[in-house]
């Protein structure tokens, strides 16, 4: 977990920008605030920064972020924070924003479920898909007592699957990634998917097919989990059923269900902001239907939107950049080149050190 403290001592101390959400997009937005010489405060509902990457997939490897041929999710989060941390953004953890109010002077108040109110000159919503919970298999009934010991909806540590007989349910990117990713750790891996074809990335799907051809895994398409067996509070068997009615049983110690998440905008849905496809509609400046209120990342919607990390980082840059005209009206917005800015900061730090 990142070593982050909360330096906020006065909730009424106004900041230039409130960033709602501390996932990759929100963290990078904080860095961009520093680059553009404005203050910010991140408010994150969870107890740590990083969003789903830190909470659900810390050991998952990511391949589609520029400059990183391959990077574990938690390492990407730590790298993003290393960038943002140099500008000392305020960070509020464990508080969910429930309401915002735009005041007569154009500034904003954001209220959290802890009863705290934070003021800023503008707001950037980078809350991902909102609150999320894993999709479950209704035919299995209530299996909460097995969750975290035999049944999992995410891989937080591969050690939980080391030497185990694992049944994975799903056909998307996560299911395919972990089918390949757990090969080195699990005793056996069985992949079950109810459709005829995988929905995940073609490259990973090919790797799964190759592993099947090599006899490293079992793959059952057009098949679903019918029921499970347990003994002394631990999973022992998974019963499978094919689309043609054939049934059989596999021995299993772990059931990894990776069939996606249900997202819920929560209070955001009642904020009188224009919505489309369960997201906030933004213009080319990442502005929502309310002046001074911006959105970036998965929570933002516009024609042709791609919901990937790389897009969110770009949108964070644009949102912060365009928020300057609202935060500092009348001021000329100048281009900021990172190499020049960093050189000036380094020189200033050296001069300050000499003066001591």
Swiss-Prot record:
The entry's keywords: FAD, Flavoprotein, NADP, Oxidoreductase
Binding of FAD, residues: 25, 44, 52, 57, 97, 132, 298, 339
EC number: 1.18.1.2
A single GO molecular function term of this UniProt record: ferredoxin-NADP+ reductase activity
UniProt enzyme class: oxidoreductase
Gene3D superfamilies reported in the protein's UniProt record: FAD/NAD(P)-binding domain
Top-level taxon of the source organism: Bacteria
Keyword Oxidoreductase: yes
Swiss-Prot/TrEMBL catalytic activity: 2 reduced [2Fe-2S]-[ferredoxin] + NADP(+) + H(+) = 2 oxidized [2Fe-2S]-[ferredoxin] + NADPH
Cofactors that this protein relies on: FAD
Cofactor binding annotation: Binds 1 FAD per subunit.
InterPro entries the record matches: FAD/NAD-bd_sf (IPR036188), FAD/NAD-binding_dom (IPR023753), Fd--NADP_Rdtase_type_2 (IPR022890), Ferredoxin-NADP_redctase_2 (IPR050097)
Family: Belongs to the ferredoxin--NADP reductase type 2 family.
Subunit and partners: Homodimer.
Protein name as annotated: Ferredoxin--NADP reductase
